[in-house]
Amino acid sequence: MKYNPNEIDAKWQKNWANNQTFAASNTSIKPKYYILDMFPYPSGAGLHVGHPLGYIASDIVARFKRHKGFNVLHPQGYDSFGLPAEQYAIQTGQHPDKTTKENIARYREQLDKIGFSFDWSREIRTSNANYYKHTQWIFIQLFNSWYNKSNDKAEDITTLISLFQKEGNTNINAVCDDNIAPFSAQDWTGFSSSKQQKILLQYRLTYLAETEVNWCPGLGTVLANDEIINGVSERGGHPVIRKKMTQWSMRISAYAERLLQGLNDIDWSESIKESQRNWIGKSVGAMVSFKVKNQKSQVTSEATLSDLRPSTLDYIEVFTTRPDTIFGVTFMTLAPEHPLVQEITTPEQKAAIEAYIEKTAKRSERERMADVKTISGVFTGAYAEHPFTKEQIPVWIGDYVLAGYGTGAVMAVPCGDERDYAFANFFKGQNGMPEIKNIFDNVDIATEAYGSKDNVIIANSDFLNGLNYKQATKKAIAELETLNQGKGKTNYRLRDAVFSRQRYWGEPFPVYYVNGLPQMIDAKHLPIALPEVEKYLPTEDGLPPLGNSAKWAWNTITNEVDFNENINNTTIYPLELNTMPGWAGSSWYWMRYMDPHNDNEFASPEAIKYWESVDLYIGGSEHATGHLLYARFWNKFLKDKGYAPTEEPFKKLINQGMILGNSAFVYRSEDSKKLYSKGLISDKTTQAIHVDLAIINETTNELDIEAFKKHPLYSDYANAEFILENGKYIVGREVEKMSKSKYNVVNPDDICNEYGADTLRLYEMFLGPLEQSKPWNTAGITGVFGFLKKLWRLYFDDNGLIVTNNEPSKESLKSLHKTIKKVTEDIENFSFNTSVSQFMICVNELGTQNCHERAILEPLAIILSPYAPHIAEELWSQLGNSESISTVAFPICHEKYLVESDKEYPVSFNGKMKFTINLPLDLTPAQIEEIIMKDERTIKQLDGNTPKKVIIIPGKVINLVG
């Protein structure tokens, strides 16, 4: 009876599906274990062998936990909103819903083929209206909340309104917009409804504001920083510029400190935690106000939100972590986008300033942060006044200052900051750049800045002279507060998250507008479903794609979507045209899995209380400052509102490494007329071009030239001259990220079809530690497949089952329990690769021992089951068991079988080992010596001589000294 993986795989995958073997219950007396993978975006390319790596690891843990008696929730779904589907719709005219469903069907087929124990009865899709109605509901809760710093939590907006009615806003301790005008309770009562709404927008956790965004004209939408690479969109490579737009934003900054402190309570890798700490960017210092010398007057409009803020144009507000260095301020730098730039720039400098702003708009914030070598800037012609010395300080703009961090302005102290030092020296001698001031006692700044706070005394600083860092900081803040030109402050780099996207394929906002102000649609009328549109591009007048819909207005009488032509702004109003970003649906999805068929709420309190939070989360580290941060933010908000039981959504996080592809390249000349073989390019200028692996010999790396010429991807080179090595064209090879665009993708279906799903599962784990990246090497697969065939032969010969009920040998029991111990420890420590090695050792040992005993082979099938579930189920069934192997308790290691009763002693003569002998460990040295001296091999070695000394160390060595 031969091992036939294709038959076995299909049989048990069908069995699991029909019996819903892995469906979890929300009411079990078993302890719960919730294990989750970051759900995939269903792209048209399908899965390659790199994608299942994390899923296989999580599946091993899920199956193991079931064996250990846990009620395991291991769900799967699809993050199905997103830009790629929309771009494909634009190109082909197909509705994104259609292509998304097709892609999901393909993903499901591939996932099923690998044999994952997902609870598919809980599948979710973020693009389904019955899912995103709850995303819309959460948005409404955020809109109707404010952050009370006194209670350190989000509260309902009605409590804020009540405080306004009683005492105005002067004593409100809230996270809100800066520089809100003070008002009394009487003022509040006298404000118009629209003005009250505008004020509340400055406190709400989701709000409308004019924001600097990454605008991609080619895609017609705003992009997040992590969607931009080297100044162009990750999707399509389109240029990205910075521009101001009125956008929905999320006040994630309210949770900055809690997000920071929460990292201490979760079991995540230190690298991910550090990424989030840096992104949150806590710094303690002071806010300082510098009076601007030649500002222009500012006219405010009653019709805009800005009428609620007092004029801040008399001062440049600066946050600094080094108020002790305030007497070292040599110049000031504003972000090019700073609102003061246009107000203070002199006519003489206007042209240079505008040219610089235009240039800067083409760079993303991430690029500007990363580029520490390039120095650029322009003098505005304006001056600020030093709060203590009253000296004039020139005001520059520079792209190393970001509008969204701090106040978008810095006080430049070149003697104490390397970047300020480089900037001052670069523009040394130019108009608006004074000499660098040195305020450190006995410190030489002739060649570099002195950035240390330690072991330095302040000098040339009036009342701060002779003080150290801590003393001078405290004194400077006190004096600034006396002048009413500063105060101590804790600042965070974390900025509020832009939540609007100008695209079609995303969650619609449950928002309509009355007199330009946002109104929430009542939750009982959700979902607000995406409308049909004729095209998915922005409208001709620049509105988002939803502007193409003829039916996108809200009727407040019928409480349903109405035709635009019926808008009367008395009962029927325009709906929001933007959609939510790609991260909206993934910011709470783990909670929906707890109760996915609940139509009334995103999950029942009972289900949430039972499952609580995710015990193990597996996914890529690239989400460190995106999804993982937003998910923590939403979870904390839902905790504040009483909907989540814990502060943190994911107790433990593992980031799987990548499986790398082995790419192939041909090398073209500059004129594209010649293609050089790899060994001939060292002295030539060439460009490497990725080659489809299907047209090369994987063993010899030889290119099939005729196939290359006929390949549709390379038709441009059909007439090119191939420069060969020894009559062959040898391609170059390089290990890099596996990607369809690099033509180095290996399809898991191909592996499953040829070797079976269990071979793929074992091989991916065998490649190396889960968290490391490793190259794919097809050559190793046959070894794993051979192991499974060898395992099969322990149970079957050509005639059928050969398992006996005989008593197993001590050696076989030792091999089994050694493996039970090792595999248990490995799974608990997530060291899956070493388990596969142990399985191979065990099967080799059992084969040598000619072991066919049920007492060994039945538990062996169970411990193999998490890794290779199909063959394990088949073996278990063939052994006469009717229930699924997944329901059986995991074997326990009995240490008594691991105790060594014998020892293989090396026997040496004058220190040279000549043979080995197996002896019981309980023998005394005298008994060992007696046995050794009678052994024929000893007699032969001594050749009639008597040893001078016999050295015996029990359990270790025997040495005869002649």
Swiss-Prot record:
Location of the motif 'KMSKS' region: 737-741
Origin superkingdom: Bacteria
UniProtKB keywords: Aminoacyl-tRNA synthetase, ATP-binding, Cytoplasm, Ligase, Nucleotide-binding, Protein biosynthesis
Motif 'HIGH' region mapped to chain: 40-51
Catalytic activity: tRNA(Leu) + L-leucine + ATP = L-leucyl-tRNA(Leu) + AMP + diphosphate
Matching CDD domains: Anticodon_Ia_Leu_BEm
Enzyme Commission designation: 6.1.1.4
Any single biological process term in GO: leucyl-tRNA aminoacylation
SUPFAM superfamilies referenced in this protein's UniProt entry, alphabetically: Anticodon-binding domain of a subclass of class I aminoacyl-tRNA synthetases (SSF47323), Nucleotidylyl transferase (SSF52374), ValRS/IleRS/LeuRS editing domain (SSF50677)
EC primary class: ligase
Pfam families: Anticodon_1 (PF08264), tRNA-synt_1 (PF00133), tRNA-synt_1_2 (PF13603), tRNA-synt_1g (PF09334)
One GO CC term on file: cytosol
Residues given in the record as ATP binding sites: K740
Location relative to the cell: Cytoplasm
Database matches in HAMAP family: Leu_tRNA_synth_B (MF_00049_B)
Protein name according to UniProt: Leucine--tRNA ligase
Lineage summary: Bacteria, Pseudomonadati, Bacteroidota, Flavobacteriia, Flavobacteriales
